[in-house]
Structures are given as structure tokens and as C-alpha cells.
Amino acid sequence: MRRSILVLVTLAFLASVFAMPQFSAAPNGIGEVANTPGCFCHGLTPSDDTKVTVSGLPEQFNASETYSFTVTIQNDVMALDGDGVVTDGSRTVPYGGFRIFVASGGATISGVDATLVQELEGGLSHTVDGNKFRSWDFEFTAPADDTKTVELVVYGNAVNGNSGAGGGTSGDYWNKVEISIPGINAGSTGPSASALVIFITAVGLAVGLIFVGILWVFYRRSPETFTMAKFWSFLKPWLTTTDHKEVGVMYFLFGFFFFLVGGLLALLFRVQLALPENDFLTYDEYNSFFTLHGTTMIFLGAMPMIAGFMNYVLPLQIGAKDLAFPRINAMGLWLLVFSAPLIFSGIWSGQGADITWVMYPPYSSLSEANLGESLSGYGANLGTISFISGMAMLGASSTLSGVNFITTVFTMRAPGVSWMRMPLFTWSVFISVFMLYMSLPALVIGVFFLLFDHTLGTHFFVAGGDPLLFQHLFWFFGHPEVYVVIVPAFGIVSEVLATSARRSIFGYKSMVFAMAGIGVVGFIVWGHHMLTSGMDPFWRAAFMITTMLVAIPTGAKIFNWLATLWGGSLVMKTHTLWSLGFLVTFTLGGISGMFFPVAGLDIHFHDSYFVVAHFHYVFIGGTVFALFSGLYYWYPKVTGRKLNETLGLWHFLIGFSAYNAAFWPMHALGIMGMPRRTHTYTIESGFAEYNMAVSIFAFIFGLSQLLLVWNIIYSGKRGEPIGKDPWGGWSLEWSTTSPPPTPSFHDIPTQEDMNALYGHHSEAPTLKEKLWKGEPKEATS
């Protein structure tokens, strides 16, 4: 009877999903939006036949003065269709369009006729009625500071008027003009470096200071006998090592450094967004900053830090002396190290990559190779080629790591470390690298096709190719990539909470199957990133259902962690606090994520700040918080000393509070309609107060990481010395010295069942007793 009811409920749910009102898919976008004539049909390259004329603007502006100007589009070559001979303004089909915005300088522009002009993503564009003209009137209000120079960018397109039912036209040619208007007191300025060059110089200076610091520490050991030859003999073993522990330390330090670099990038564009109509960064600088921020935090920050834990801890947990292929492991590290300069090197040209971390074509494919020399300026920035090359090298590094860890777990487990007695962190790494290894080919193929388009002039993703193909390739990798970084975080939290609760993890087998389930389902949900790109309703419903299924294994893990805490005796340490913080923030991020599989809601949330809030709650509140927890937990094993608990407590209290205060308001911004990846916004939008709050708390969260940096440095020298096992852990890494020797085990250990050997918490009350009886079971005499 119960089974029949369950079947009926399931069928009713599926029927309701398929019956849900859906937006109609169009080949080029979302139904009614895409079918607005003349709005989405622009070609990939500008046309010299289209002339964009701007008249009425002053050569120099007076502070706060308002000027009237006109934008006119002309194309004498284009043959008009339909009612194209009708007097301008009374036609019923598209005739022309524009896009105008202030790139820098802080001026404002507005349309004279509100029926013809609308605000669009920080600038102005035409309405449907405005699409019937080729001339529009505007007002330019100068900034209050007449020492500035205002930069205007005006796009104009001429349309021949033959749009059909599907939208668009067969004749649509555009061009653009860029205009500089200095204030009357702007004067001439000396040469100055761009914000990007200043930033990368600061990063290089930081690297230099780190090197000088290492040199100083070595010098202080013995000033009388110091020579550079001896310093090199100290440094060389680290640069040429194949020991999994030293490679792991370098992975983590590399990732932590770029985690700070990526955070600094975020703070710089939070300054830009703190105030409406701000010009702290230009459009191009902003685009490059958030491109490098996303790429740095994910590929150069989070993944290397996770790889550091993988390299150091996994062989110790399974009782292996090293990884299966130590030289390949070291090679993967150095491929990662040399990919970073490639990703950032475009900054020295003054044009860092501006294609975002998702690298969507056709813009990312456009270059001199397929546009020609005269039009090459309309393609992606010069730094894009080196950026894409760096991404390809990252793919090679990750592939080598995947092979290594999979082979190690299969072949090098110590006696007693059976599949169902492996630590959950080892399981999480195994599942994570399997997902990485299976998903990487799609990314590597897409990246190389993108590189060929950009350098050889091929047409995989530009005219004659299919830009949506890249989206499929990227997200087939990109969504499993989310789980590649979060599943090891699950493993870290499982280790920390079980040890802190003084009991084994509740529901061990279900935790293993839940992580494996996430690993499988993670490959069949990528389409939810593309619900607004045009998709068959059947596949849209299928991706909606599979995305919702992810909540089942994830929810099982949350309840198992809570049951572990309930059934244990919790000891509150800094690593425990960060894991508890993970439970709160990751759960909130998961709840906000359940809005996106609903296609009707995704229309409104897609590319809004609601997505930014969700992603950061999962990525920082999930992955980074777990990494902090793992750092406080395993730091004693690496150094033989504990991190300072007082500094750790302040790090948690300030960081956790500021993090939530910074990212929670982003949900409200998304609901209000603020688009992501926007350079600025108007005062009238109502976004200013939330953005100011977000920026302030983002700075507090960023500055709180300096407590962690100081704690790592201070505790390495003056931290409390510890023995093998300061926390009471049970897995094999706690059976060797702190730090472990090289090789990690002189004799391969045998893992025993601690519950069977020591009656592990045999007298502790069971979960059932706590829930229903309220009293522990009576001790037997």
C-alpha cells in the first residue's frame, strides 16, 4: 500500500513538472525577448559602411553643465526593404539602433524622448519604438569635477527592415565611435600606468618580499657562515623534491598566495561598485579584474589548496610511503606554477584577458586571425591568447594529478584499509579526482578549439561554427568542477566533526554512497546553466529534475553530520568552529541554489546577483571554510606545532560574521534586478546602499585573513609543540610523528578497527536513546 502511494506521488510530481508553464525556446534566446525585432540580430564584426555621427557635444565641458547632442546612423550602401521608403519615424519595422554608455569620467546621459530610449546595463539603448529611427536626441550632464576627462562609447547599427516572425533581419550592420571630452581644467597629464599594471607590479613585489623573507630567515640561522651557495643548497631540495609532503606544502602555499591575490582583485572591483556611477576602474579594467578574480580563486586558489591537502594527507591516511608516481606529481605542480604567469601576462600589454572565467564565445574567439587587421580591435583583449594557453596548461596539470591519486588509492592501501574502512577524506579525494579526470577532456577540447579560433582563424565557435557548443563543453566540465572542489571539503568536515565529537562518523556507508551519488548525478545536470540559451522543453525538464536530485545525497550528508554531533561529546576548537560554520553557510547556499532548476524562475535570476550570492555561499562558505578547518586541524601534523587558538577564534568570529554580512545582501540585489558582471549602476536603480554594505564587509572579511597569515607565520616558530595525535584522531596519519619522516612510513602499518579494539564510546548514549528516552542507558553491574 505504501509503495503504491509512493509511486502515485512520484508520478503526480513528474506530471506537474512537465505541465509547469515554460518559456518557449527560440534558436537565439528566450522567446519574447529574443523576438523583439532588431535587438539580437547584430553581426559579429563592425561594418565600415555604417557611419555613426555624434553632434552637439562640447570640445571641453564645464562642471555640472548639461549639453544636448544627437546620434545619427547612416548607411548609404544598404538597400531598404518593406516600408523602408516611408518617412523616418512612421515606419513599422526596424530601421536602426544604438547602445551608448560612459566608459569613465562620471558623466550621465539621458534620452530626450523616453518612448525611444531605455536604460540597459549601465548605459542607454533604444526601445522597440526607438528601433524605427536612425537619429536620437540625448542630454549629457557633465560631472562636478571639471579636471576629469569623460570617455563616451557609442554603438550604432543600421537595419534594412526585413525582420520576420523569428526576429532579426538579413541586413544589419554596425559600427562604433569613442569620444573623449576633457573638462575645462583637465589640462595635460603625465604618463601613468593602468590599474592592471599597478596591480601585477604589486603582486610581483609581494613575491619578491616573500623571497627576501625566506633569505632572511636562512641568514639568521648562522650569519657568520652564510653564503648564497649554502642558501641555494637549502632551496634546491624544495624545488626538485618529489616527496608528497613537500609537494603538498608547496601546492597549499601556492594556492593560499593566489587566494589572497584573487581576494585583492575582488576588493578592487568592490571599490568600483561601492558607489553608483563610479569610475574608479574603466570598463576594460573592470572586465579584466573580474575575469582574473574568478579564474584565480577557482583554478589558482581553491584547487591548489585542495591539492595540497590531497598530496600531504591521503598517502598518510592509507598507509602509503608516497604517491604512485612521485615525479609525475612534481611535474603537475610545476605545470600549475608556470600556468599562472601565462594567465596574468596579458596585463603587461595593458590588456588583461576580459573573457570571464567561463570564456564564452563568440567574443572570446574573435581576434585578428578571423577579423582581419583592420577590425582586430573589436575582438577580445590581447591578453586572451596567453590566458587561454594558461588554461590549457592547467588542464594538463590536473590530468596528471587525477591519474596519480586514482592509481595510489587502487594499489597502495595498507593492510586493513579496505574500501569500506578508508577515511572519508580519502574517499572524497578518490571521488573528486575521478570526476575531474572524466570531465577534463571536454574542457581541454573546448579550450584548444578556442585557441585555434583565436590564433589560426578556425571557425569552431565564430560565424560558421556554434558558440553554444562551447557552453556545453565548458559546463560538462564546469558543474562537476564545482563538486571537484566541494567533495574534498565534505571529506575534511567529516574528519573534523567526527574527531571533535569524539565518536566515529554517523552513517559511514551512507556518507560514502552519498558522495558517490553526487559524483554520478553531477555529470547530468550541466544543462541548468543553459536554461536561458534555448533548449528543447523535454531536456529543460530533464535537467530540472536531475538538478533537484542532487539535494538528496547532499541532504543525507547534512543530517549525518548533525547526527554525529548529537551522538558525540563535542570539543570546541578552531577547526570545529570552521566546520560548524561550513554546515550553516553551505546549507544556506544549497537552499538558494534550488531556485535555479525551476526554469520559470531562472529566467529572472539568471545572470543576476542572486547567482553571485549562491555561488559564493557554496564556494567560500563551503570549500574555503572547510579548507580553513582542515588547515587548523592538520597544521600540527605538518609542523609539529599548533596554530594559536586565540588568533584562530578571532579569525573565525570576524571572518564568519563579515562573510555573511557581505554576501547575504547580494540575494536582495539579485531579486531587485542588479545584473552580475556590471561595471556600474545608476543612483535611481536603488542598488547603492546594499552595494556599499557589501563592499565594507568584504573589506573586513579580506582583512580578517591577515590574522590567519600571521597565525601561520607566528605558530610555525612559537606555536605549542605537540606529539603524534593532539586531537584524538583515529586514522593512520596520526600514528606517525609530527612532522612525518621521509618516507612517511618506514614499515607499512596495519589499520585496526578502533571500535573493536578499545570499545570506542561503547557507553555513550545512542541517537535513539537521546531522541526518545532522554536518559543514557543504565550501566550494567
Regions found by a protein language model. Give the residues of each.
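Core hydrophobic alpha-helical transmembrane segments of single-pass membrane proteins
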Residues: 202-212
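Short, solvent-exposed linear motifs at loop/edge-of-secondary-structure regions
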Residues: 65, 139-146, 556, 560, ...
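Hydrophobic alpha-helical membrane-insertion segments, chiefly the h-region
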Residues: 15-19, 210-215
